[in-house]
A protein has these predicted regions:
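N-terminal leader/targeting and accessory segments in enzymes
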Residues: 1-92, 96
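Phosphate-binding loop of NTP-binding sites
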Residues: 22-23, 59-62, 71-187
Length: 187
């Protein structure tokens, strides 16, 4: 029996997770409380991935084996509270993607400021050293989408504080913390 995964949010992160889950033979359903952009709707349709928009069907979501939560969805959202009450595992797209990278390496960059510049510079150095690498995460393709469509030996990942929510076993080979300031204290 296929494992049922529900992905909350149909932006870059959610659609990337849906593509990877589909390629890994999961039963996939994407749910977005808002309207899905034409670009992402076309990707879901062309890959025959089931989805809904402008609302969440709780009976389906609460029957999932696992939920992948997009980083823009706050922990205090009603649907997240219900999922937690049912003790359904909730993970991030970053956590999900790292399950399928095999022996590839990850350089993860996070911090309050300077993530994008540091990620781009690190990627540039690795690329010019002729490493088989991709820039993913909060810049470029989502981590999951890159793993699903064009796997590499090295991933240079910009990871925001929101993308670090629901991390369980993700352990990058190199972690860079640019700095810490009093940002996003409301989450």
């Amino acid at each position: 029996m296929k494992k049922r995964v529900v992905i909350l949010g149909a932006g870059e992160s959610g659609v990337g997770a849906a593509l990877l889950a589909t390629r890994q033979d999961y039963e996939v359903f994407v749910s977005d409380a808002g309207k899905i952009s034409d670009q992402y709707r076309a990707e879901l349709d062309s890959n025959k991935i089931a989805y809904e928009e402008t609302g969440h069907t709780e009976s389906y979501i609460l029957n999932a084996d696992e939920v992948i939560k997009s980083p823009g969805i706050p922990e205090k959202a009603g649907i997240i509270k219900k999922i937690r009450e049912k003790q359904i595992p909730v993970i991030s797209e970053i956590e999900f993607a790292c399950r399928f990278i095999g022996n590839s390496k990850v350089i993860a960059i996070t911090g309050s400021n300077g993530k994008t510049t540091t990620t781009a510079l690190t990627y540039h150095i690795c690329k010019h050293a002729e490493m088989d690498c991709a820039m993913v995460g909060n810049i470029g393709f989502s981590f999951a989408k890159q793993v699903a469509t064009d796997p590499r030996e090295l991933y240079v990942a910009e990871i925001s504080s929101f993308q670090l929510d629901d991390i369980v076993s993700f352990r990058p080979d190199v972690a860079i913390l640019t700095n810490i300031t009093e940002d996003h204290l409301d989450r």
